Amino acid sequence: MNNNATHNAPNLRTLAEGVLQPLGYEVLDVQVQNPGRRPIVVIRMDRLDEQPVTVEDLETASRAVGAEFDRVDPIAGEYRLELESPGAKRPLTRARHYERMLGLKARVRGDGHSFTAPIKAVDGEQVTFDVGGEDVTLTVGTFQGNLAEFPDRHR
Protein backbone atom coordinates (compact mmCIF):
# COMPACT_ATOMS: atom_id res chain seq x y z
CA MET A 1 0.00 0.00 0.00
CA ASN A 2 1.00 3.61 -0.54
CA ASN A 3 2.99 4.98 2.40
CA ASN A 4 2.40 8.57 1.23
CA ALA A 5 -1.36 8.09 1.01
CA THR A 6 -3.69 10.22 3.03
CA HIS A 7 -7.11 9.77 4.56
CA ASN A 8 -8.11 13.13 3.12
CA ALA A 9 -11.86 12.90 2.39
CA PRO A 10 -11.81 15.71 -0.24
CA ASN A 11 -9.17 13.82 -2.26
CA LEU A 12 -11.18 10.60 -1.96
CA ARG A 13 -14.31 12.50 -2.97
CA THR A 14 -12.58 13.81 -6.11
CA LEU A 15 -11.50 10.28 -7.05
CA ALA A 16 -15.00 8.88 -6.42
CA GLU A 17 -16.69 11.68 -8.38
CA GLY A 18 -14.41 11.06 -11.36
CA VAL A 19 -15.53 7.43 -11.46
CA LEU A 20 -19.21 7.76 -10.52
CA GLN A 21 -20.38 10.81 -12.49
CA PRO A 22 -19.82 9.16 -15.90
CA LEU A 23 -21.86 6.19 -14.61
CA GLY A 24 -24.80 8.48 -13.75
CA TYR A 25 -24.20 8.86 -10.02
CA GLU A 26 -23.59 11.83 -7.74
CA VAL A 27 -21.32 11.75 -4.68
CA LEU A 28 -23.16 13.44 -1.81
CA ASP A 29 -20.69 12.86 0.99
CA VAL A 30 -17.42 11.06 1.75
CA GLN A 31 -16.37 10.28 5.30
CA VAL A 32 -13.35 8.46 6.65
CA GLN A 33 -14.32 6.73 9.88
CA ASN A 34 -11.98 5.02 12.33
CA PRO A 35 -8.88 6.76 10.87
CA GLY A 36 -6.49 5.52 13.58
CA ARG A 37 -7.03 1.86 12.82
CA ARG A 38 -8.39 0.17 9.73
CA PRO A 39 -10.24 3.09 8.14
CA ILE A 40 -13.73 2.80 6.74
CA VAL A 41 -14.38 4.99 3.70
CA VAL A 42 -18.12 5.71 3.52
CA ILE A 43 -19.41 7.20 0.28
CA ARG A 44 -23.02 8.40 0.24
CA MET A 45 -24.28 8.58 -3.34
CA ASP A 46 -27.39 9.28 -5.36
CA ARG A 47 -28.46 8.83 -8.95
CA LEU A 48 -28.18 11.85 -11.24
CA ASP A 49 -31.58 10.99 -12.76
CA GLU A 50 -33.06 11.30 -9.23
CA GLN A 51 -34.49 7.78 -9.30
CA PRO A 52 -34.15 5.67 -6.14
CA VAL A 53 -30.72 4.09 -5.60
CA THR A 54 -30.98 0.30 -6.01
CA VAL A 55 -28.82 -2.51 -4.65
CA GLU A 56 -27.54 -2.97 -8.20
CA ASP A 57 -26.50 0.71 -8.29
CA LEU A 58 -24.56 0.27 -5.06
CA GLU A 59 -22.86 -2.87 -6.39
CA THR A 60 -21.91 -1.16 -9.67
CA ALA A 61 -20.61 1.92 -7.87
CA SER A 62 -18.70 -0.12 -5.28
CA ARG A 63 -16.93 -2.16 -7.96
CA ALA A 64 -16.04 0.96 -9.97
CA VAL A 65 -14.77 2.99 -7.00
CA GLY A 66 -12.96 -0.04 -5.56
CA ALA A 67 -11.13 -0.60 -8.86
CA GLU A 68 -10.10 3.07 -9.03
CA PHE A 69 -8.93 3.10 -5.40
CA ASP A 70 -6.93 -0.08 -6.09
CA ARG A 71 -5.37 1.56 -9.14
CA VAL A 72 -4.55 4.90 -7.48
CA ASP A 73 -3.90 3.50 -3.97
CA PRO A 74 -5.06 6.62 -2.04
CA ILE A 75 -5.03 5.07 1.45
CA ALA A 76 -2.07 3.64 3.34
CA GLY A 77 -2.73 0.11 4.59
CA GLU A 78 -5.97 -1.80 4.57
CA TYR A 79 -9.35 -0.10 4.57
CA ARG A 80 -12.99 -0.96 4.04
CA LEU A 81 -15.05 0.75 1.35
CA GLU A 82 -18.79 1.23 1.91
CA LEU A 83 -21.22 2.85 -0.51
CA GLU A 84 -24.70 3.78 0.63
CA SER A 85 -27.80 5.57 -0.54
CA PRO A 86 -28.62 8.96 1.00
CA GLY A 87 -31.18 7.65 3.48
CA ALA A 88 -33.30 9.69 5.85
CA LYS A 89 -30.47 12.07 6.81
CA ARG A 90 -29.65 12.91 3.19
CA PRO A 91 -26.97 15.60 2.90
CA LEU A 92 -28.25 18.65 1.04
CA THR A 93 -25.26 20.24 -0.67
CA ARG A 94 -26.61 21.87 -3.83
CA ALA A 95 -29.52 24.21 -4.55
CA ARG A 96 -31.27 21.50 -6.56
CA HIS A 97 -31.20 19.20 -3.51
CA TYR A 98 -33.19 21.80 -1.54
CA GLU A 99 -35.51 22.40 -4.47
CA ARG A 100 -36.23 18.68 -4.68
CA MET A 101 -37.13 18.60 -0.97
CA LEU A 102 -39.29 21.77 -0.81
CA GLY A 103 -41.70 21.68 2.11
CA LEU A 104 -39.72 19.10 4.08
CA LYS A 105 -37.72 19.89 7.21
CA ALA A 106 -33.97 20.32 7.01
CA ARG A 107 -31.43 20.40 9.82
CA VAL A 108 -29.17 23.42 9.28
CA ARG A 109 -25.83 24.21 10.97
CA GLY A 110 -23.25 26.90 10.27
CA ASP A 111 -23.15 30.52 9.12
CA GLY A 112 -24.21 31.48 12.66
CA HIS A 113 -27.33 29.33 12.51
CA SER A 114 -28.48 26.07 14.03
CA PHE A 115 -32.10 25.06 13.46
CA THR A 116 -34.49 22.51 12.01
CA ALA A 117 -37.15 24.01 9.76
CA PRO A 118 -39.14 23.45 6.57
CA ILE A 119 -37.54 24.41 3.27
CA LYS A 120 -39.77 27.23 2.02
CA ALA A 121 -38.19 28.40 -1.24
CA VAL A 122 -35.12 28.18 -3.45
CA ASP A 123 -33.99 31.04 -5.69
CA GLY A 124 -30.70 30.38 -7.44
CA GLU A 125 -28.24 29.59 -4.65
CA GLN A 126 -30.47 31.16 -1.96
CA VAL A 127 -32.52 28.81 0.23
CA THR A 128 -35.28 30.16 2.47
CA PHE A 129 -36.41 28.29 5.58
CA ASP A 130 -39.52 28.92 7.70
CA VAL A 131 -37.99 29.20 11.17
CA GLY A 132 -40.84 29.66 13.64
CA GLY A 133 -42.84 31.76 11.18
CA GLU A 134 -39.85 33.92 10.17
CA ASP A 135 -38.02 33.57 6.86
CA VAL A 136 -34.30 32.81 7.12
CA THR A 137 -32.46 32.89 3.78
CA LEU A 138 -28.99 31.38 3.45
CA THR A 139 -26.60 30.83 0.56
CA VAL A 140 -25.83 27.23 -0.40
CA GLY A 141 -22.26 26.40 0.54
CA THR A 142 -22.17 28.65 3.61
CA PHE A 143 -23.91 26.12 5.87
CA GLN A 144 -24.42 22.38 6.26
CA GLY A 145 -27.87 20.94 5.65
CA ASN A 146 -29.36 17.50 6.03
CA LEU A 147 -32.87 16.28 5.49
CA ALA A 148 -34.55 16.02 8.90
CA GLU A 149 -37.60 14.01 7.86
CA PHE A 150 -38.10 11.17 5.43
CA PRO A 151 -40.34 12.04 2.47
CA ASP A 152 -43.58 10.07 2.13
CA ARG A 153 -42.66 9.41 -1.52
CA HIS A 154 -39.45 9.38 -3.54
CA ARG A 155 -38.39 12.85 -4.64
UniProtKB/Swiss-Prot annotation:
Its main location: cytoplasm. NCBIfam families: PRK14645.1 (NF011239). One of its GO terms (cellular component) is cytosol. This is Ribosome maturation factor RimP. Keywords: Cytoplasm, Ribosome biogenesis. Belongs to the RimP family. GO terms for biological process: ribosomal small subunit assembly; translation. The gene is rimP. It comes from Deinococcus geothermalis (strain DSM 11300 / CIP 105573 / AG-3a). It is found in: Cytoplasm. Required for maturation of 30S ribosomal subunits. It comes from the Bacteria. SUPFAM superfamilies: YhbC-like, N-terminal domain.
